[in-house]
Structures are given as structure tokens and as C-alpha cells.
């Protein structure tokens, strides 16, 4: 009887012990779970070891806490803590911030070829036309375009700076479209820079720096003579020749167009081929303007003309003489000699009795009209 009572008491105690142990296990399991939203679901209990994604980060439920494991890239690739990855032309590191929370940290800049560049480093674009720099900008790094590559493909020209190449000045500029390039902004002549629109002399010609089709060109717009600037069509005189400034596409010249003479006290231009007369009461001298070798002109005396009773009757070339019988006057004649002078010629009218004295060195010619 007493033994049965002892067995009953032991059985009851055993049941209580098992029940208590089971309750302890259940409490521990409950404390190991995590309560949070994630994986696109509302807040719920997550079991020990479950991975939970929240925003751009992922965690693991450990002992009732969410332990950060890493970050998610833009392609949803999982990046473990402490590892780097490339995204949007930058290199990021998945890290814990100073506040203990997981975050993305900028690590370096990335070129179009996939190479990484640390803070302060520079590199060029694929075509070697401009260059970048990886700049420190507080908590982030930024890729900035720093300047252009010069035309020799060697030197670097910072934004806003100029560079001279092959007779022209170029400036590194960033256009409103964002394109960065060397833009033509001026011309260079004999070491002097000229901006667009400025004029300069080069020998016998006048040029100006013109912007055409986005590029500067050196356009000839005129001539230089006697220290004066002349433009297309304008004329000037030099050494008895009249010149005209002619500017044509692909061609320019100081073209001789006439003879410069003094007539009645005035400077007169006679075009090439023109004929004119220097008058006297009984005779006149015919002259013409003609070319004289390479781009020069000269005044040539064509001859002397004898006038009789108001009409031109006899023509003589310089250096010749003749005897002319006067009309309607029997046995009456006159001697005519066209003698060369320093400025042309003169007609000598003489008595035939003085023929030898007035015709020395001259050649006889039959009398003829003009």
C-alpha cells in the first residue's frame, strides 16, 4: 500500500517535469523568431535562418534579430557585406555605416571600358577627345569632365582654356547639349592671335578671321597698297600704272587695268586699249595705254597727226617724216616730221628747203591719212 503511493507520487512529478521542459522549449523557439515585413509581404513572424529582403538590403533572422547580410544591386544581385560592385558608372561597396545600419558607399568611378578609377585619377574617353576626373564630393564620388584632348592627341586642355594648333586657336567648351569639344575661336598669323571678325594684313593682301560652318577660316577680303587697305574693285596708282584690287573665290590679285596720266592738271586713268589725243592748233599726238610685261602698263605714242584747215590729213609714226603737197596749191608742199620726245612725240612742220636739217635720223614715209 505504501509502495503504491510512492509510485503514484513519482509519476505525477515526472508528468510535471516533462510539461515544464516542453514549455521552456516553446518559449525559446518563440524568442528566436523575427517579426518584420519583407520579401514583399506585410509584417509577420520569420523563423530562425530565414532570409528577408527589405528595400535594397537583405537580412537573416538570427535569435530574434535581423542580421544584415548585404545589399541588392539594380539588377537584384545580392552583394555580401564588404564586397564591391559596379552600377551606373560607379563602384559601390556594401557596408555598415557609423550608425550600424547597412548602406551603399561610393568606392570609385568606372569608365566606359569598365575600369575603375580612384579619387583624383583621370582618364580619357574611348575616342581620346576629352578627359574625366574622379572627384571626391563629400560622402560620394563624382565623374566630371575636366577638359579636352588637344589636336595632337597628347596634351590636355582644361575646360574654358585655349590651345593653338596649325594656325588657329581652339577653346575647350561644353555645349548646351553637354558635348565637350575643342571649338575654333580664332586665327593666328605670324604669332599674333585674331578673334572672329578681326582683320589683319599679310603682305599685299588683307584678311579677316571668319567663322564658317563652325570652323574659323582665313578669308582674303582686300589688298594692301601704300599702307592703305583696299577692297574688291578699288583702285590705286603706282609708277604710272593703275591697279585694281580683285578678290575672287580661290584667286586674288593687284591687276593692272590702266595708265595713270596727268591731263589738264588732273590725275586721269586711261584703261588698257584706250586712245586719246594731245591737241595743238595745227597738229595732235595720238597716244594709247597698253600692257608692259608682267602686270604693268605704259603710255605709247601711236603717231603724229597733221591738221589742215580743221581736218586731220596726214598721219606719221614716231621717227618718220614725209613731204605733202598742199591741195589745190600747185608746186606748194610742206615738210612734216614726227619726232620722239621724252614724254611722247611732237610734229615738226618745216619748209622743204630745210629738209636735211629737219629730217636727220628720221625715216621717210609716204604721206597717208589717218
Curated annotation (Swiss-Prot):
Pfam families tied to this protein = Fn1_2
InterPro entries to which the protein is assigned, alphabetical? Mig-18-like, Mig18_Fn1
Superkingdom in the source lineage: Eukaryota
Q: What is this protein called?
A: Uncharacterized protein F42A8.1
| Protein's organism | Caenorhabditis elegans
Amino acid at each position: 500500500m505504501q509502495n503504491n503511493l510512492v509510485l503514484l507520487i513519482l509519476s505525477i512529478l515526472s508528468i510535471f517535469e516533462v510539461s515544464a521542459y516542453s514549455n521552456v522549449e516553446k518559449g525559446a523557439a518563440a524568442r528566436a523568431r523575427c517579426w518584420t515585413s519583407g520579401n514583399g509581404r506585410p509584417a509577420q513572424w520569420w523563423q530562425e535562418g530565414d532570409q528577408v529582403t527589405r528595400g535594397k538590403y537583405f537580412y537573416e533572422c538570427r535569435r530574434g534579430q535581423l542580421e544584415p547580410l548585404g545589399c541588392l544591386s539594380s539588377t537584384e544581385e545580392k552583394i555580401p557585406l564588404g564586397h564591391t560592385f559596379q552600377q551606373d558608372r560607379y563602384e559601390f561597396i556594401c557596408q555598415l555605416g557609423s550608425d550600424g545600419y547597412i548602406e551603399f558607399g561610393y568606392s570609385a568611378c568606372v569608365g566606359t571600358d569598365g575600369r575603375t578609377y580612384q579619387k583624383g585619377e583621370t582618364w580619357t574617353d574611348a575616342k581620346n577627345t576629352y578627359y574625366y576626373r574622379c572627384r571626391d564630393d563629400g560622402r560620394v564620388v563624382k565623374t566630371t569632365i575636366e577638359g579636352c584632348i588637344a589636336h595632337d592627341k597628347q596634351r590636355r586642355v582644361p575646360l574654358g582654356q585655349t590651345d593653338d594648333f596649325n594656325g588657329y586657336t581652339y577653346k575647350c567648351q561644353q555645349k548646351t547639349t553637354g558635348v565637350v569639344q575643342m571649338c575654333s575661336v580664332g586665327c593666328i598669323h605670324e604669332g599674333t592671335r585674331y578673334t572672329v571678325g578681326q582683320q589683319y594684313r599679310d603682305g599685299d593682301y588683307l584678311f579677316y578671321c571668319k567663322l564658317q560652318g563652325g570652323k574659323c577660316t582665313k578669308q582674303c577680303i582686300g589688298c594692301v597698297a601704300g599702307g592703305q587697305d583696299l577692297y574688291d574693285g578699288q583702285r590705286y596708282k603706282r609708277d604710272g600704272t593703275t591697279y585694281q584690287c580683285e578678290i575672287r573665290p580661290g584667286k586674288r590679285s593687284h591687276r593692272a587695268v590702266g595708265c595713270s596720266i596727268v591731263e589738264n592738271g588732273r590725275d586721269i586713268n586711261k584703261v588698257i586699249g584706250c586712245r586719246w589725243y594731245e591737241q595743238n592748233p595745227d597738229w595732235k599726238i595720238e597716244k594709247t595705254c597698253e600692257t608692259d610685261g608682267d602686270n604693268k602698263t605704259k603710255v605709247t605714242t601711236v603717231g603724229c597727226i597733221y591738221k589742215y584747215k580743221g581736218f586731220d590729213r596726214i598721219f606719221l609714226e614716231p621717227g618718220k617724216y614725209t613731204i605733202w603737197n598742199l591741195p589745190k596749191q600747185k608746186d606748194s608742199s610742206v615738210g612734216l616730221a614726227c619726232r620722239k620726245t621724252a614724254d611722247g612725240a611732237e610734229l615738226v612742220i618745216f619748209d622743204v628747203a630745210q629738209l636735211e636739217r629737219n629730217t636727220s635720223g628720221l625715216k621717210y614715209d609716204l604721206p597717208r591719212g589717218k
